[in-house]
Every structure is written in structure tokens, then in C-alpha cells.
Amino acid sequence: LRAVMKFLPFYLITSLFVWSSAVYGQVSQILEDEAVAWLQGLIRVDTINPPGNETRAVEFFADIFDAEGISYETAESAPGRGNIWAKIEGGDEPALILLQHTDVVPAEEEFWTIDPLSGDIRDGYILGRGARDMKGLGIIQLATFLSLHRSGVELNRDVIFLATADEEAGGFFGVGWLIDNHPEIFEDVGFLLNEGGGGSSDEGDIVFGVEVTQKVPVWLRLTAIDTPGHGSSPRPQTAVTRIVQALNTLLENPFPPRIIGPVNDYFAALSVDMNEEWGPSYADINSAIQDPAFVEKLHANRAGHNSLIRDTCSMTRMSGSSKINVIPPTAWAELDCRILPDKPAEQFIAELDELIGYTGVEIETIMAFTPAISETNSRLFDAIVSVTQELHPGSRVIPSVSTGFTDSHFTRDLGIVSYGFNPLITESGEHTGVHGNDEQVREAAFRQAVTDYYAVVRNVVID
């Protein structure tokens, strides 16, 4: 065999290597190298939203698909707002979508130590806006999709690669638009993998969070109207004081804690590795939240977990007069509210109106999604558990609830079982820079995630 291999062309050896690795559930060093290069290249494609310009990313993927001989379709929801999808056909089982968004949030270059669109590797890390959110996972999905294509193995279901626009601004030019204008993409789809989960390692203890639901964003504008006047003659009540009064009422009356099923499961799983200070409370979180002292301590020390036990509203924008010496006729404030997915937005808004309605402010809904939860009794979730435990002995998989939102809420509304899963392992204390400065992903962890993601998907799509 060695003698035969000696005279084979390099490209054929490469193809055999990739094929044999794919057949046995692994990806090759060659594909890992390609994935690193692809991620660097995709980071360099400017898709900062606003304005998005995701068609640039569509062209990036189209070039790769053309080289691989893979057919694909594209559609713009607006000029420059491109979406692309491709399919590997398989058997009659409900299809699997690998979903990613190609837009990224802005980066304030003066606070970075490197060009945010450089994609350079420094000290073992790939840097740039989107390295983690979510061009990194997008390339991991691409590597899996191409591995399946190159292997030529028979699949039990269709596998769809879907890269979309606008998630960072709500997804209305991406998945939301595609559901309305290209519903055929989502027909006969049973499973979807998206962002929202991740792996963490603390002194070798590895935990993979799989997002099964998320808090529902309810973005609101409070508006007050009152008599205008000169700033030199203060009035006892103005549009501005009404807004201040409403906001102060919100501050003084936090929404009461309550526990939904996925949060209870999540806290119970976390309790296993916690010390005596936190472990018993997390193990029985329903009882723990009855103690105001615990709730206060949780809020002070673990803000993210506090957000999982109650509805929240962050005060993010305000406006009053355009001049310092004018009492304005109107004033407004905007709230980023996130509610647990066990109640509709309409009920939450009615409760909010009961709380602050006495101030005379009007509540306007800017954006609100519908709540949905993906159950864990599925072949896909079982595959995530079994494969990650095989690849990382002793690791655990925890169903998690995201305080942020992803495009999965759109697909859950269609009845598609949608999980946020990313096998990328982040070490305790490791800088990530997601939505911040010097966003980065450890190259070694990224390479491992390429292998792990493919193994999970392969388990589901090959009998």
C-alpha cells in the first residue's frame, strides 16, 4: 500500500484521506486546516450590521460550493441582504438544518488591539469580529456539510446548510423573511442546529450547554405627554417626570421570581459541581427563591442566573427636550424586556401596565416574539449526549435557557426541534470578546470543535 501511495497524485491522496476520515466519523487534519483558513477569510468579509451587506458572505460561500460542485440557491431580502442555502439529499427521515447568521455586531476599533476584520492568528487565537458570534460556528457547520458531501455516504435524511442575514437586528431580513418568502426551505424539516449553546471547562470538568429555549424579547417604548413650558418655571408634573416616575417604579418593583421547567433542570445540573454556598440552593431552586436573601445574593453575584428566574427590563434609551431650557411636551424611554417563555408578551405588557399605568405613560410594542421550548426527548439530543461523552469522557450535557435570543424562535414556531449547540470548549477565565473587544477563539479548541460537530451530525444522519 505504501508503494502504491507513493505514486498517487497528491490531490488523490488528499481525497482518500478526507473520504476515509469522514466514513469513520472524524474529519481530517486537512479539513481542519481548511476550516481555519475559511474562518480567517470569512472574518475578513465585512458584514457588520448595520448595514449588514450579507451578500458578501453569500458570495464567499458560493465560491466554495462552486469549487465543490454543490448546487445552491440565494435570495436577497433587500439590496445587499443576502441569504444562501444548499442541500445534500438523503432518505425520508425529517431533514436537518444547519443554521447560521452571517452578520456581526459593530466593533469600536479604537478599543481593539488588532484590526477587527483581520482574522489574524495571535498567540494561538483566531481574532476578529464574528470569531465566536457566529462565523466560527458557521465555518464548523460548513466543514461538517462538506465532509458529508465529500464522503458520498448515504444519508437517512436531507441535510440543509442555511446562512442568513440580520440575526443581530432581529432576523427580519433573514430567517423571518425566508419563512414568508421561501417556505419550501423549512418543509419536512424535523431538526435544526443553531447557535446558543457551548462547552466550558473548569479544571478539566467539561460541560456542554444545549440551548432548548430562550427568554422572549419584548422591546417597548414608554411615551408621556404633558404641558410644555420654560425651564425657568418648573411644573409639578411634566412629560419627563412622568417617564422618570414610571422608570423609578420599575426599579423599585422587580418582577417576582418564578421557575420554569428547563431552568429548574439547568440549575439542578449546575448544582452538582457547586460548593456548599450555592449547591444546595441550586439543587432546589424552587425553594431557594422563596428566601429574599438568596434572591438578593443571586442578583448581586450572578446576574445572568438571576435573569433566568424572572422577567427583566433594562432601561436602555431615553429622550426628552432638544434644548436644556425647554420643558418638552413629550418624553420617551425604551426598555429591553426579556420574559420567561411561559407567558405571552400580551400578558406581560398587561402586567406592566398595571404596575406603571398610574403615571399616565403609554406603552408601545416595538418588537415581541412568541415563546417556544424544544423538548430533549429526541434523537438529535441523544446524539449530542452520547457523542460528546464518547469524545470527552466524564463530560456532561445540560439543557440550557438563553437570556438572549437567536433565530431559533422562528423555527420553533414552525414546530421544528431547534437546539443551540456548539461543541467549542472555552476554558474557565478565557477571554472571548463576544460583542466586545478583541473577539477571539482558541485555534486548538476550534479545530476540536470541527471534529466534534461532524461526529454529532453524522450520528444523526447516517444509520
Short names for language-model regions:
Residues 176-178, 232-256:
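A short core secondary-structure module
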Residues 20-22:
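N-terminal signal peptide c-region/cleavage motif recognized by signal peptidases
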Residues 126, 132-209:
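Acidic/histidine-rich catalytic neighborhood of metal-dependent amide-processing enzymes
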Residues 90, 198-203, 256-322, 329, ...:
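An extended, acidic, His-containing surface patch that forms the Zn2+-binding/catalytic region
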Residues 1-12:
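Bacterial N-terminal signal peptides that target proteins for export
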Residues 37-47, 223-226, 359-367:
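Acidic/histidine-rich, surface-exposed loop or edge segments in extracytoplasmic proteins
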Residues 26-129, 148-157, 335:
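Acidic/His- and Gly-rich active-site-bordering loop/insert found
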Residues 237, 348-356:
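Short amphipathic alpha-helices in soluble, non-transmembrane regions
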